[in-house]
């Protein structure tokens, strides 16, 4: 049976910690979408490991790991990440990682194009990580990309990559700083190494599910960055939602047991795009400092603000969570008053929206309707039992459950793996 961990906001919710906790009981850990733009850290036996492209199930020596068909696969990052894990003493990683032969290859060409497209957009830039994720998915959708399976046919590979580079050069001219022959030469070496890792992922997952193996699926990014359901166009270029998990891994939906939505106890966002509860003053700065809000992948500081339950309720309607993992509750310990967004009010009509609209111009003009809570002003760090939380903290958690309609099954109360309440 499969357990799925999904981000319910704009990413950086703390999915990695729950993945780390659940990994020891998993036989397979898989990723379904995105690329090396994602990022989180896992602490195992006192050592911190950074993961971007690779599934974090690699910290479990008994767990096999799969990069699914929906991922855009940057080959240099794959090998460099493996090397970094080995350098930190993680044993046997090369024997426990597999890649779908249907993955699209994310070339350095795509990263070069990513930067040029952001410049082209000017003030309307998306705020991407610059890792070529969007251009990779664009070439996939236009059917001009290269699949991993095609890397092994040298003639086909070179023809398709040259065509891709020629097309971009016609568009950008001398602004495109990229040497296609250099990339082709690098892939001559990768072609020798990749066969050890590439598998038919459809058969891999089918066999695993037929044998009732325990599969843990870690979502990258989050629902509000989904290409269809997020704050378009300020989104990623894949589907980091439940639907994307099913298509990206060919998972049998009837064999999904648990879907966990990970929710930070406040809200953060990296890059541009609408963020109704953002606080650019003292509150936002305090959340940023206490929560250590800067990205693993980019180092960029995260925008911070109050918890937006309209967003969480919307994501629950799409991802159908069976439970929530509320993270970083302890970050709120010193706030005398807390706020959560429960609706958006259109000042033109007076109408209150309790569901996230597609029309961002409507959202822009809306005012946030907040519910205030009394803070608890006492440390919650390292607390392991719900009953030991201050009454105000319990009230905060219970209101989230009531509003979203999903039970909070886990509550993070600190940075360590052990700092988790189970309910």
From Swiss-Prot:
EC numbers, comma separated: 6.3.4.4
Cofactor(s) it depends on: Mg(2+)
Range of residues in the leader sequence: none
Chief subcellular location: cytoplasm
GO MF terms, alphabetically ordered: adenylosuccinate synthase activity; AMP binding; GMP binding; GTP binding; magnesium ion binding
Residues involved in substrate binding: 296-302
Pathway where it operates: Purine metabolism; AMP biosynthesis via de novo pathway; AMP from IMP: step 1/2
Name of the protein described by the UniProt record: Adenylosuccinate synthetase
């Amino acid at each position: 049976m499969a357990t799925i961990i999904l981000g319910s906001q704009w990413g950086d919710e703390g999915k990695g910690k729950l993945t780390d906790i659940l990994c020891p009981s998993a036989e397979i850990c898989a990723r379904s979408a995105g690329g090396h733009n994602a990022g989180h850290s896992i602490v195992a036996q006192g050592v911190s490991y950074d993961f971007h492209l690779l599934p974090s199930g690699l910290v479990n020596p008994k767990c096999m790991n799969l990069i699914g068909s929906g991922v855009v696969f940057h080959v240099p990052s794959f090998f460099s990440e493996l090397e970094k894990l080995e350098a930190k003493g993680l044993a046997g990683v090369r024997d426990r990682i597999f890649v779908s032969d249907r993955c699209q290859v994310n070339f350095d060409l795509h990263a070069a194009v990513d930067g040029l497209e952001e410049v082209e957009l000017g003030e309307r830039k998306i705020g991407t990580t610059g890792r070529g994720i969007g251009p990779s998915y664009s070439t996939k959708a236009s059917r001009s990309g290269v699949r991993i399976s095609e890397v092994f046919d040298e003639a086909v590979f070179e023809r398709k990559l040259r065509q891709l580079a020629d097309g971009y050069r016609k568009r950008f001219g001398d602004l495109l700083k990229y040497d296609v022959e250099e990339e082709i030469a690098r892939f001559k070496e990768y072609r020798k190494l990749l066969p050890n890792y590439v598998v038919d992922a459809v058969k891999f997952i089918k066999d695993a599910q037929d044998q009732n193996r325990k599969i843990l699926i870690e979502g990258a990014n989050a629902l509000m960055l989904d290409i269809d359901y997020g704050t378009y166009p300020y989104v990623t270029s894949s589907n980091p939602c439940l639907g994307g998990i099913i298509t990206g891994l060919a998972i049998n939906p009837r064999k999904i047991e648990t879907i966990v939505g990970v929710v930070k106890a406040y809200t953060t966002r990296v890059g541009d795009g609408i963020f109704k509860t953002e606080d650019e003053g003292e509150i936002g700065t305090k959340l940023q400092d206490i929560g250590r809000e800067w990205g693993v992948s980019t180092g960029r500081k995260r925008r911070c603000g109050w918890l937006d339950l309209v967003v969480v309720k919307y994501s629950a309607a799409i991802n159908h969570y069976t439970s929530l993992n509320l993270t970083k509750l302890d970050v709120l310990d010193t706030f005398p008053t807390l706020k959560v967004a429960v609706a958006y009010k259109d000042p033109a009509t007076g109408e209150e929206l309790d569901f996230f609209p597609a029309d961002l111009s409507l959202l822009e003009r809306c005012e946030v309707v907040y519910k205030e809570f009394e803070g608890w002003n006492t440390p919650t760090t390292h607390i392991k039992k719900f009953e030991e939380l201050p009454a105000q903290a319990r009230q905060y958690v219970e209101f989230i459950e009531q509003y979203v309609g999903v039970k909070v099954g886990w509550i993070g109360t600190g940075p360590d793996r052990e700092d988790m309440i189970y309910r």
